[in-house]
């Protein structure tokens, strides 16, 4: 039901096992961990302190059991239409890649892939918003970075078939992605099936 991580490879092993969900709401911490760690001001993501926390602990236990529940309010920042704070999702991923280059070389491929998924996540939000015309240069830059990772994503076993279609379509054409997104909503409405597109 769970796994205990410890030792000098703690961070690498946790990340390689896929347990790098970076939100703090699904974790329990010793209070003393935050004696010297503070969340950065005006940041959208909790994730900026992820490596800092793991570098200060000697053991991490990851459980599959449900311990408590997270309630997402309608006015939660996670539900807002695109705003510039969402770009922090990319900033922390690129920071992690930079950290991997400096201290965790074995995590470079994983963090590089993580960056591509960050571009996908943010551009997916932007492509579905009314702001895409006002932020066209940003959209094009994210699209360029996504195209660099198409082969990486297609070969990955971390992305399902529908996710690969969504990623590739967004990397190639905003209109194609938007069309597939609307088609997905239509199919879901008719069949009641889950979304085929991410995000």
Model-derived regions: residue spans:
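Conserved nucleotide-sugar donor-binding catalytic segment
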Residues: 2-83
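All-alpha amphipathic helical-bundle segments outside canonical DNA-binding/catalytic cores
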Residues: 106-114
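Active-site catalytic microenvironments for nucleophilic, acid-base chemistry
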Residues: 36, 56, 99, 113, ...
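Membrane-interface aromatic/basic loop that binds lipid-linked glycans or pyrophosphate carriers
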Residues: 128-199
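Catalytic core of nucleotide-sugar-dependent glycosyltransferases
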Residues: 67-73, 79-107, 121-151
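GST superfamily/GST-like fold recognition
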Residues: 116-119
């Amino acid at each position: 039901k769970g796994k205990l991580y410890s030792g000098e490879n703690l961070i690498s092993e946790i990340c390689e096992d896929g347990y790098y969900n970076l939100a703090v709401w699904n974790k329990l911490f010793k209070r003393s961990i935050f004696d010297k760690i503070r969340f950065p001001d005006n940041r959208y993501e909790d994730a900026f302190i992820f490596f800092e926390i793991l570098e200060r602990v000697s053991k991490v236990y990851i459980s599959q059991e449900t311990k408590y529940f997270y309630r997402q309010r309608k006015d939660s920042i996670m539900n807002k239409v695109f705003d510039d704070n969402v770009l922090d999702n990319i900033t922390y991923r690129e920071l992690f890649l930079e950290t991997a280059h400096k201290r965790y070389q074995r995590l470079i491929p994983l963090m590089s892939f993580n960056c591509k998924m960050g571009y996908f996540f943010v551009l997916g939000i932007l492509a579905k918003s009314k702001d895409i015309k006002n932020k066209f240069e940003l959209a094009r830059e994210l699209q360029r970075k996504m195209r660099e990772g198409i082969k990486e994503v297609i070969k990955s076993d971390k992305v399902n078939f529908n996710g690969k279609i969504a990623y590739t379509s967004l990397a190639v054409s905003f209109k194609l992605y938007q069309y597939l997104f609307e088609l997905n909503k239509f199919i879901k409405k008719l069949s009641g099936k889950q979304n085929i597109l991410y995000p």
